Amino acid sequence: MILKHIKNAEAKDENKLALKANTIYDCIRDRFFISSPREEDTIDGRDPTLLISLLTAIINGKQLTAGNFGRGKTTSAEAIIALVHGIPCDATMACEARGDPEITKEEYIAIPDLTNMNNLLWRRFAQMPPKVFDEFNRMPSAKQSLFLDGIDRGNFEYMNQTLRAEPGPFYATMNWPDRGNVEILPPMLDRFDVSVITSAINPMYHKIMEEVDRSILEDGVIAAKMLAILDANGESYQKKIAELTELADAFRASISMQLGIGEGFTSKELATAREEIKNIEYADTGDNFKLFIRSETICPTHGEYMPGKACGGDCHWGSGNANEESRVGFAAITSPISERFFKSLSAYAKALAWYLNEKEVSKDHVRLVLPYVLWHRVQFAGDFMAGENKYRVGKQLENAKDFTKKIFNRFTEQEERINELGEALREPEDKNRKEHLAKARAFFAKIQKYANEYDHPIFAHALQMLGKQGSANESTDK
């Protein structure tokens, strides 16, 4: 498998760090995460659950993994953390939080130091950079807010003190609804960048599944040292992280050689990979597709709706005035779309482009990650896309995929016009605002023509913006 990637590297001048990520993916797929996705569900031939989980580890994202119990939600995260971040599985397990109706801050965030009441003893979960929260939806709604800021920004607070945790990936698992769990609140769901689903494996793989052995990803000696570092009282958090990093690099190098996947990542290489991903530019069509998606999240006529409502029959683009193929986002989705959504979409589209050794983020990279950034955040209108998958496990993800297909088709049908619009609205490199407005206003008549020919909110939004800017600019000139 490594030889295959080396040949690809020679043919495509492949990024060496992306090559390592591909090799780690193959290792986990072949040895620790057996799956059988349908071909139509794959991302460029790869299992989406495993691939997105790997990207989460690399970019320090926040991921919610849903599925029935016993489907490998937690163990897959532990294996990825071991290979990417160098934390043995037994150390990760000792630091995990677990959903509990009676959960308290003292269990997983901090406790007072009884020898010095001005001091706190921060819990392992709060300190360890890669975090796993098992069965997150076992917590009552009132308890979920205890972890809101920790998930969002890595800040853990207790008794007027704050621990700013070292950045790392955050994995939470969620079982499908049963008598023991509760609904995760929408603001909490919005904190998760992506969500994936683990499913039952094809029975024909039973022999392989029974032979999976992840003991190589454990190390009792290194795990004990890591836990001792986290439990040490009086040592600065920065020093603890430095000591953890040294142990993690040693463990990661050791298991990578044992598994035959080369040297694996070092901590410095992971930081470099994140910087490379951050600096990948969007191709114009990729950027324009993001703009197109954004234009479908708010109605140009009525603005934003309250949660639980979609733009209805009294709206020009509402549910009563559009067929299924042309029904835009705000008429199909009953949940508000936040700025976090677009940041998550951009981050994972960039990560996918980097992993696939592409130099720019295309519309296809955005399309491929969109369902996984969207489905856990939104509710679809009751009459929208129920269809044959109404009772299937993961129907929300299936609906998000259907929605993605339809919005992508709407974009590609008018791509040439939208690319023209994007070019007209794109700010020049010299940031000359007056020149930018003049260029956009010169395009105003063409936008009006497009708005009449192709009835889509993106043109209505553009006309509104240019009309207001034009009026403001004329007032200033006077």
Locations of the language-model features?
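Short loop/turn elements that form and flank the Walker-type P-loop nucleotide-binding site
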Residues: 51, 58-60, 71, 125-127, ...
